[in-house]
């Protein structure tokens, strides 16, 4: 293989990405829309790149062909009664990546939850499926610092009861969640 571009989103694996090594640069070029832990070393060494875009812009970049997608690898739930597999906890850029891909390869995992919304794909749209039954990878939860907790309390006081939130990863988001425990809904 030569000149294969591997585009990823939020990598949660703690170890370095095995494809992001200097000796493999002729074969693989790692790119990400975030700076995930598993690519930080490679990015510092110039072996991997960040795609300078907001998360919300990535679907447009896929659909416009600015980031072409030949093959999309994804993890999905088992199909529902209508044959749809949910992207579950990965309902971000993979939906548009899969939509634009020439080939779609799915790891179907019974542990992937079915989630509401349009982030799903019909099993007939998958070119290959690998059945896997393994717990989902979890992001380690960092302990919020005292400053994180003060910021979290300030933010939580501004959030009305019943609000819908998108929460990131890190000490401050965890502090916000902790501070929201007094909210009822």
Q: Where do the PLM segments sit?
A:
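Conserved alpha/beta enzyme-core scaffold
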Residues: 1-185
């Amino acid at each position: 293989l030569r000149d294969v571009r591997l585009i990823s989103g939020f990598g949660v694996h703690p170890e370095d990405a095995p494809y992001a090594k200097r000796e493999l640069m002729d074969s693989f070029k790692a790119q990400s829309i975030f700076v995930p832990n598993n690519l930080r070393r490679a990015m510092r060494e110039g072996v991997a790149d960040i795609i300078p875009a907001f998360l919300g812009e990535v679907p447009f970049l896929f659909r416009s062909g600015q980031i072409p997608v030949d093959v999309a690898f994804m993890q999905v739930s088992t199909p529902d009664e209508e044959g749809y597999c949910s992207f579950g906890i990965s309902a971000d850029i993979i939906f548009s990546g899969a939509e634009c891909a020439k080939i779609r390869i799915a790891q179907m995992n019974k542990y992937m939850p079915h989630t509401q919304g349009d982030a799903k794909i019909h099993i007939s749209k998958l070119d290959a499926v690998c059945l896997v039954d393994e717990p989902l990878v979890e992001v380690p939860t960092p302990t919020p610092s005292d400053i994180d907790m003060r910021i979290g309390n300030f933010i939580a006081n501004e959030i009305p009861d019943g609000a819908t939130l998108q929460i990131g990863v890190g000490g401050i988001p965890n502090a916000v969640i902790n501070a929201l425990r007094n909210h009822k809904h």
